Amino acid sequence: KITARQIRHAVEEHRANASHEHEVQPGMVYISNPTEVGTLYTKAELTDISAACYELGLYLFVDGARMAYGLMSEANDMTLQDYAALCDVFYLGGTKCGALFGEAVVITNDTLKEDFRYAIKQHGGMLAKGRLLGEQFLALLDGEDGTGNSLYFTLAAEADRQAMAIRKAFEEKGVKLLHDSYTNQQFFVLPDEWHEVLSKNFAMTHMGKPDKTHTAVRICTSWATKAENVETLIEAVKKL
């Protein structure tokens, strides 16, 4: 994660440089929530970042590819309304949350709304059968009343629950976490022999080797994860 203090420092350092025209001019802060390692920005942190952006004349963009999983996490204190109040632009992820394709962009800054549709004239942005993108989100968000009762959020909530069950199984075996994630992405530091055993039957993303005898991995659940597959993994972990 980044902080409001880091943003201020970076921009102020740029503006204090007498040759700043040779650098890219800061114009926007881009963050992901959840982050790529499953951590979450709190409402207080995002409020501070938003204030720093406003003070410095920057736009704030939030990558929401995994936003549903973040919103349904037990550690989350953000709402969609908070995102709308604090960000200039954010988007609801589709492909990671059950949609066949596409994302739903939400623009809250009125200045950025003007002429946005001209984006279809850039880089092949005109999507044939584009209505099908919207139809997916109509189905995923049907009946949503702010309580997370739509398909979009119930799928994410179940994936988070499954991920935390997997995390519990690994922690009970004394496995250390690479990152403290409370979302559908979990990161573990496994003894190499355990990694070799589990890799034969389960898909894990290799995240590097923190030392000569351990391997860091990422295990993800999603809208498509079956309960029986989670139970099979948990039973395999117990037998290590």
Sequence positions of predicted segments:
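PLP-dependent aminotransferase-class I/II
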Residues: 1-27, 31-34, 41-48
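Alpha-helical scaffolding segments of alpha/beta enzyme cores, especially the outer helices
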Residues: 9, 44-55, 78, 82-85, ...
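A general structural motif
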Residues: 24-26, 57, 214
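Active-site C-terminal subdomain of aminotransferase-like
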Residues: 25-35, 40, 78-183
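Active-site-proximal loop/turn and secondary-structure-junction residues that shape catalytic pockets
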Residues: 35, 66-68, 96, 223-225
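Catalytic PLP-binding core of fold-type I/II PLP enzymes
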Residues: 41-73
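Conserved C-terminal alpha-helix-loop-beta "cap" of PLP-dependent enzymes
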Residues: 164-165, 169-238
